[in-house]
A protein has these predicted regions:
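Phosphate-backbone binding interfaces of nucleic-acid-interacting proteins
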Residues: 530-649
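Helix-rich, typically C-terminal accessory recognition domains appended to large enzymatic cores
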Residues: 126, 333, 338, 346-383, ...
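Structured secondary-structure scaffolds
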Residues: 2-51, 106-110, 154, 160-372, ...
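Short secondary-structure capping/junction motifs at helix and strand boundaries
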Residues: 92-99, 119-132, 144-145, 159-161, ...
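A broadly conserved sequence feature marking short terminus-proximal activation segments
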Residues: 74-133
């Protein structure tokens, strides 16, 4: 840790479930976490900001099968692919220090060790689970916890589940967890405490199912291979494994743990405020200092959900209005601890009012007047007037302290309100002092210079405090102010701009938007089908004669069996019915794109008169036909009514 650092600050988002592209709700939480991390860095803290993806579970296994690819290929595309999770965070200027994927090998081995430790301690035991399961939420429920017979979190149907499973003795820690919630500020907002105690703890905390046998896409329980670790155990310990706990990938556990705050959506507060501390107690580990459960962004009064399809695409909004405008809107408009209704009208109104009219106008007018009246550089001779300047200077002088008070409570909306109260006062200060009138009187030039200096210094402080929310905008404003100081200390002091400050002009920071036209354009964008982004066509091959083509024998085949080839990441081995009565074996390099069991029973096309060849020591008698475009590969599949052995002519 550096000598000048105030201390460490470890902050996390939840790790997101990549069953589909992320939406504006995920972006909201991540932008808030990023703003807090940037604020703490601005203050001089040694910050570790962790985010990532929770990649195991039944829902992803099911989605991958539906898509016809392996679960790993499925999550790789969502996380690493074009406009995936990492691309979105890059677009949104998210300054995370570490990104964890629960499929990372160091995390997998660490979770197996942790699971075994709790088992050997007696806090995990084997039993039989009987109850209800919500696949979209990856949550188990008892009958008494259901709401109108449905999942109390998402309102969707639940399915009965009965299987052999391992359980965590959550009931053992009910008293300790209750005391933690009731008698400390571990969980905020306080309303979440009442919900957890009244709905989950006091009715009787039951032991938690922590393994599954009905699907395979998870971390295997290494001492009982038929079981995979239940997704929430796998997910929660990411906050430790990403620091090097029970692995040698990193060495930051002692440096950063315990976490200063976990930011999570209110739908997963139960896991973070009840299950997570109980498991840490079982392991004898320090608890995080705080869990903050933020509200939802609602659309038409309901929660956004990937599985419901009622989501807002942050990519579209950020590319259309700018990253900083979207970041600002999310944290200026919605109280972080409460639900908020998202609308295009609110977004455009926020950009026009706060960013174009207030902040943008203040910067452009002040810089333009400095150029117009003083050629872009203020003179040293300036005349201050307490009765006219005092109110603005007092507001700026107290701003950092008021802002800090709100930021420490994660009240981002209030912190921004403090800044924009000063911005509004500065715009009023222009009207009160009428620089255009002062410019007409040569004897008033010192007074004019001081008015403009006061405005530029106000802009410096406000822009500096906006950095956690709009980092690129702050950089641009400071550039226009001649590289003005914006470190934390300087933002609490008046007069850090030199008297003879030189400024430079630039385009409007946030041009005004025509509300009616823009709403119509957005409506069309949302209603139009997405444009397909196609890979380029492959280069054509040299011509062949018809006589050559006639020599290729293409036969309809049906998949009898399919399995992965050992020690190969690419090959699948097929046993095929080709109509001859003897199964034909073909090896095909499509393991990245398909689960073997998903292909059994499918009707395909094979070239059956190719000379046999060995691949990975096994004989392949032919080739399956597939279509290739860019990095995508799909098998040619036919209607199941076509009999094996039929020839393509």
């Amino acid at each position: 840790m550096c000598d000048k650092c105030k201390g460490k600050f470890y902050i996390t988002t939840p790790i997101y479930y990549p069953s589909d592209k992320l939406h504006i709700g995920h972006t909201y939480c991540t932008v808030a976490t990023d703003a807090m991390a940037r604020y703490k860095r601005l203050q001089g803290y040694d910050v570790c900001f962790l985010t990532g993806t929770d990649e195991h579970g039944q829902k992803i296994e099911t989605r991958a099968k539906e898509t016809g690819v392996t679960p790993k290929a499925f999550v790789d595309h969502i996380v690493e692919g074009e406009k995936g999770v990492k691309d979105l965070w890059k677009l949104m200027n998210i300054s995370y220090d570490r990104f964890i994927r629960t499929t990372d090998s160091y995390h997998v081995s660490a979770i197996q060790k942790i699971f075994k430790e709790m088992y050997e301690k007696g806090d995990i035991y084997k039993g039989t689970y009987e109850g209800m399961y919500c696949t979209p939420c990856e949550s188990f429920w008892t009958a008494s916890q259901l709401k109108d017979g449905k999942c109390p979190d998402c309102g969707r149907e639940v399915q009965p589940a009965q299987e052999e499973a391992y359980f965590f003795r959550l009931s053992k820690y009910a008293g300790a967890v209750r005391d933690l919630l009731v008698n400390t500020d571990f969980l905020e907002p306080r309303s979440r405490v009442n919900e957890m105690v009244n709905n989950f703890i006091d009715p009787g905390l039951e032991d938690l199912c922590v393994s599954r046998t009905s699907f395979t896409w998870g971390i295997p329980v290494d001492f009982d291979p038929g079981h995979v670790v239940y997704v929430w155990v796998d997910a929660l310990f990411n906050y430790l494994t990403a620091l090097g706990f029970r692995n040698d990938r990193y060495e930051d556990y002692d440096k950063y743990w315990p976490a200063d705050v976990h930011f999570v959506g209110k739908e997963i507060v139960r896991f973070h405020s009840i299950v997570w501390p109980a498991m840490l107690m079982s392991m004898g580990l320090p608890l995080p200092k705080k869990v903050f459960g933020h509200g939802w962004l609602l659309l038409d009064g309901g929660k956004m959900s990937k599985s419901k399809g009622n989501v807002v695409d942050p990519y579209l909004l950020a590319e259309r209005y700018g990253t900083d405008a979207l970041r600002f809107f999310l944290l200026r408009t919605f109280p972080f601890g409460s639900d908020g209704n998202f609308s295009n009208e609110a977004l455009i109104g926020c950009i026009n009012t706060d960013l174009a009219n207030d902040l943008g106008n203040l910067v452009s007018r002040t810089v333009a007047m400095t150029h117009k009246y003083f050629g872009g550089r203020l003179p040293a001779a300036q005349e201050g007037r307490e009765e006219q300047d005092g109110d603005l200077l007092a507001m700026v002088g107290s701003l950092r302290g008021q802002y800090e008070e709100q930021m420490e409570k994660y009240a981002f909306q209030n912190a921004l309100a403090q800044i924009f109260a000063v911005v509004s006062r500065a715009n009023k200060y222009i009207d009160e002092n009428e620089p255009w009138r002062l410019a007409k009187d040569e004897t008033q030039k010192p007074r004019l210079a001081r008015v403009l200096y006061n405005l530029l210094e106000t802009i410096r402080v406000c822009a500096g405090l906006l950095r956690p929310f709009m980092p690129a905008t702050t950089d641009e404003i400071m550039k226009r102010l001649g590289g003005a100081p914006s470190d934390w200390e300087s933002l609490g002091l008046w007069g850090r701009l030199p008297a003879e400050v030189a400024v430079e002009q630039g385009p409007a920071l946030f041009p005004r938007i025509d509300v009616e036209q823009e709403l119509q354009a957005l409506e069309q964008l949302h209603s139009a089908p997405p444009a397909l982004e196609e890979d380029p066509l492959p280069e054509p091959l040299p011509e062949i004669t018809f006589d050559v083509f006639e020599k290729v024998e293409m036969t309809v085949v049906k998949v009898l069996a399919c399995e992965k080839v050992k020690k190969s990441e690419k090959l699948l081995k097929f046993q095929l019915d080709d109509g001859t009565g003897t199964p034909r074996q073909i090896l095909s390099g499509i393991a990245k794109y398909y689960e073997p069991e998903a292909l059994v029973g499918k009707t395909l096309v094979a070239v059956t008169n190719l000379a046999p060849r060995k691949m990975m020591g096994q004989l392949s008698c032919g080739m399956l036909l597939s279509a290739e475009r860019g990095d995508k590969l799909k098998l040619l599949m036919l209607d199941d009514g076509i009999q094996p052995g039929s020839r393509l002519v």
